[in-house]
């Protein structure tokens, strides 16, 4: 919601929408990320990632609205979220969850053991966050993550023959992927897959 209100501000120029974007920024996550504290253990991953996308949009538009304090805080929150997820909670191909949740930051074994590996929706939204951060500060680290996640996760999520989409990409040895059945399965990653 914070991203939607930030976009409404950009379209209208009315600061009430930027204020609403701030009010819809989940304080529990925002304050911890702003303060450099990773509290993502066992949290639903794709509930948190879009919040951080919104933080980045609020930061970007706060600069235009000449609200430098907001810009600094929201940039710090978005950047720390990106940094902790990409450095501490992502696999080599860019995926970052198992069973839709961030595991404990020291629980790497669950990535390999679990048949429900990283969700493509998370990676898609992390790419959206990466794009926003790159617009403000074009660092190579953003481009490196984007390339890795796009080529190794996102582009592999659509079935090459029937066009179905993948929900989870397991990291288990000798495991398989389940693709959606065209016109039948409409889970979240099918919709995100179409956006990819």
Q: What are the language-model segments listed below?
A:
Residues 1-196:
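Glycan-recognition and catalytic cores of secretory/periplasmic carbohydrate-active enzymes
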């Amino acid at each position: 919601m914070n991203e939607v209100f930030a976009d409404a501000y950009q379209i209208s120029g009315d600061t009430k929408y930027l204020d609403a974007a701030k009010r819809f920024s989940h304080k529990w996550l925002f304050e911890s990320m702003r303060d450099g504290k990773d509290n993502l253990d066992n949290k639903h991953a794709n509930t948190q990632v879009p919040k951080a996308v919104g933080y980045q949009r609020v930061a970007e538009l706060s600069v235009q609205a000449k609200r430098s304090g907001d810009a600094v805080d929201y940039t710090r929150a978005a950047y720390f979220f990106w940094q902790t997820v990409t450095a501490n909670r992502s696999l080599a191909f860019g995926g970052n969850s198992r069973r839709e949740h961030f595991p404990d930051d020291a629980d790497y074994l669950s990535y390999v053991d679990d048949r429900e590996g990283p969700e493509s929706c998370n990676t898609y939204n992390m790419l959206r966050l990466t794009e926003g951060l790159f617009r403000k500060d074009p660092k190579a680290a953003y481009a490196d993550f984007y390339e890795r996640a796009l080529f190794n996760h996102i582009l592999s999520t659509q079935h090459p023959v029937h066009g179905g989409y993948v929900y989870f990409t397991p990291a288990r040895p000798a495991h398989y992927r389940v693709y959606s059945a065209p016109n039948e399965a409409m889970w979240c990653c099918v919709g995100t897959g179409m956006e990819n």
